[in-house]
Amino acid sequence: MAMGFPARVFAIILRISPGRVRNWMWRWWYQRLAKAHQRADFRFMNYGYKDDETLKLSKEDEPNRLFIQLYNMNIRDVDLKGKEVVEVGSGRGGGASWIAKTYEPKKLIGFDFSKDAVGLANEWYASQTNLSFKEGNAESLPLEDNSQDIIYNVESSHCYGNVEVFVKEVYRALRTGGHLCWTDFRDKPTMEKLHEIFLNAGFEIVSKKDVTKEVLDALDDINDSKVKGISESVPMGMKKSFETFAGVQGTPVYEAFKAGNLHYHRYLMVKSE
């Protein structure tokens, strides 16, 4: 399956651009996503996760099961109740909303660089008193030093112009004993470098896992519904590009997962000193 002309141009420019330009381009893309797709039933933007565990969900959350399961996989080994929690790259807010009502943190702030996505999330989830969304840059987090208990990041960091700066920012903002829950995809050389970035920032790695199979299983399960949703709600000239970014079957990211050229990872880390 072809990427679609907008996605091809976007990918080429990303490869040759410096970090600041890449940040601007991703911001532009996600602003466009938010404006083009304002349906209230489109609240998640991740690839999903499917394993042998059956997560108990409410009837209203069931249609988003696989997307919620990715969030749950990322944060399930830490205790969020009564804690101060941040999501970096909160998108349309579906994951943060579910975590805020399910795990009952004292306060959960979702930061995203798309002003339109932040606006939609604040509108949709205004009734959740422990949840808020703010516009923010992952490489310059508007957080005090040593102020947060848990920071999590889901399928977002591959967009950042300088992921090392992001990791250092998270370390700065966490309290001693605080956790970073991170999940995203990388090729092998880039993941090896990122592993060293985590260590060099001062994090102790509590656990790590390759979850590519579980993500692929989810992508296969929701492929037809994604294609149908894009077909019904996205302008004709953008359909293939949306399919590429959604990771539907036959697109470059999906095929890279299948071929073993891209892997999806999950890391749990602690700021030990």
Tell me the role of every PLM-derived stretch.
Residues 1-42:
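N-terminal auxiliary segments of SAM/dcSAM-dependent transferases
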Residues 64-81:
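Conserved alpha-helix/loop element of class I SAM-dependent methyltransferases that forms part
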Residues 92-103:
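Conserved SAM-binding loop of SAM-dependent methyltransferases across substrates and taxa
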Residues 114:
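Conserved SAM/SAH-binding beta-strand->alpha-helix loop
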Residues 127-139:
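Conserved SAM-binding strand-loop segment of SAM-dependent methyltransferases
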Residues 139-151:
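A short acidic, Gly/Pro-enriched loop at the edge of an enzyme's catalytic core
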Residues 164-176:
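A short glycine-rich, Lys/Arg-flanked "PGG" loop and its adjoining helix->strand segment in the class I
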Residues 178-184:
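Conserved beta-strand signature within the Rossmann-like core of class I S-adenosyl-L-methionine
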